[in-house]
């Protein structure tokens, strides 16, 4: 959520109401938590202590520098490591074959060098790799044979 302190308090009030009326807890997910200033982070503290919300914060920054100490001390940090290139390459191959959620209904001839390039340039980020694959396939017209040929030059531009 893109929030100021008033927005956060409103979400907390909704969580309190949900708990009192329905006995249901609320999960509060904040992406890019490092963008919250100290006041925005501090407003969460009493509600984490009371258990009003289950809090999940995501950040691409080092949480020990980007998140204030009181909030960090009430949190469990789960560092996520970059996905190895070999696993990204395997993911891209599955995306090319998957007819339901991937590009398996498209006729794609992907050079190994191009696929490996996309995996290497993703910096361990599966979302980046999949987005680059999609750009490569969708921005390349099919040849006369009806096949989309993705070579290294296409991959470098994706």
Where would I find each of the regions flagged by the language model?
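Short, ordered loop/turn segments at secondary-structure junctions
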Residues: 1, 33, 60-61, 83, ...
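Conserved AAA+ ATPase "SRH/arginine-finger" region at the nucleotide-binding site
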Residues: 1-2, 76-89
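Short glycine-rich substrate-engagement loop in P-loop NTPases that contacts/grips substrate
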Residues: 1-27, 38
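Conserved RecA-like P-loop NTPase ATPase core
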Residues: 8, 31, 44, 59, ...
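Conserved AAA+ ATPase "sensor/coupling" helix adjacent to the nucleotide-binding pocket
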Residues: 12, 74, 87-105, 138
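Conserved catalytic/switch belt of AAA+ P-loop NTPases
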Residues: 16-17, 30, 34-73
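Short conserved motifs of the RecA-like P-loop NTPase core
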Residues: 25, 103-121, 150-155
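C-terminal helical "lid" of AAA+/P-loop NTPase domains
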Residues: 116-121, 127-142, 154-157
């Amino acid at each position: 959520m893109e929030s100021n302190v008033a927005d956060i308090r409103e979400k907390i009030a909704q969580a309190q109401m949900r708990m009192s009326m329905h006995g249901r807890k609320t999960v509060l997910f904040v992406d890019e938590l490092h963008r919250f200033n100290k006041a925005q982070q501090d407003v969460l503290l009493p509600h984490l202590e009371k258990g009003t919300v289950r809090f999940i914060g995501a950040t691409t920054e080092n949480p020990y520098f980007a998140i204030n100490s009181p909030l960090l001390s009430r949190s469990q940090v789960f560092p996520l490591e970059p996905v190895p290139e070999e696993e990204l390459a395997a993911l891209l191959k599955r995306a090319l074959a998957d007819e339901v959620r991937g590009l398996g209904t498209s006729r794609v001839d992907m050079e190994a060098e191009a696929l490996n390039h996309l995996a290497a340039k993703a910096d361990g980020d599966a979302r980046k790799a999949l987005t680059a694959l999609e750009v490569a396939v969708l921005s390349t017209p099919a040849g006369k044979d009806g096949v989309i040929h993705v070579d290294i030059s296409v991959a470098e531009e994706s």
